[in-house]
């Protein structure tokens, strides 16, 4: 089973999405593939965001804002937007979440710290959620194979006790 992938998107890819990607990479290690991008990338990462993350022992100073691409969205299992509104492409089969967070652009370190702390809490919850989903999928694929000793007739016959759960043992007929 391949590892899950997450794309963080904000307008400038200079603050919120960079901090989120930094936390996810730091806290999840190689267990989750991490991307970040912006719908209108800035020239550089927000210096207050870099400083706030350094206080947590996470260095995002070498990161640079990247443009949001269709490929980045298509290659991600979960897309988390942070204020980019309708500029983010939507693809079927992707899990989208919008994290409403203040924009750290133009803010000093004191104003960025609470944003950083909220992002950290949300990333920790995301890791827990993705870990649970991965464990559930692994358990489902590792479960015992179906009973192959039964004949086709026994498997296909619907009787109380062996009916699929969704039908609860009842037979549904269409009456015109």
What are these regions (language model features)?
Residues 1-142, 147, 153-155, 165-176:
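Short polar/charged helix/loop
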């Amino acid at each position: 089973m391949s590892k899950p992938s997450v794309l963080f998107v904000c307008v400038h890819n200079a603050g919120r999405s960079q901090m989120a990607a930094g936390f996810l990479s730091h806290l999840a290690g190689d267990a989750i593939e991490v991307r970040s991008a912006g719908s209108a990338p800035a020239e550089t990462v927000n210096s207050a965001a870099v400083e706030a993350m350094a206080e947590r022992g996470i260095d995002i100073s070498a990161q640079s804002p990247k443009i949001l691409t269709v490929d980045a969205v298509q290659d991600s299992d979960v897309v988390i937007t942070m204020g980019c509104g309708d500029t983010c492409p939507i693809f079927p089969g992707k899990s989208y979440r919008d994290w409403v967070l203040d924009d750290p652009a133009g803010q000093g370190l004191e104003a960025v710290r609470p944003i950083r702390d909220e992002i950290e809490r949300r990333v920790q919850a995301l890791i827990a959620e993705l870990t649970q989903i991965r464990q559930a999928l692994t358990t489902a694929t590792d479960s015992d194979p179906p009973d192959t000793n039964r004949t086709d007739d026994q498997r296909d016959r619907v009787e109380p006790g062996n009916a699929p759960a969704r039908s609860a043992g009842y037979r549904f007929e269409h009456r015109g």
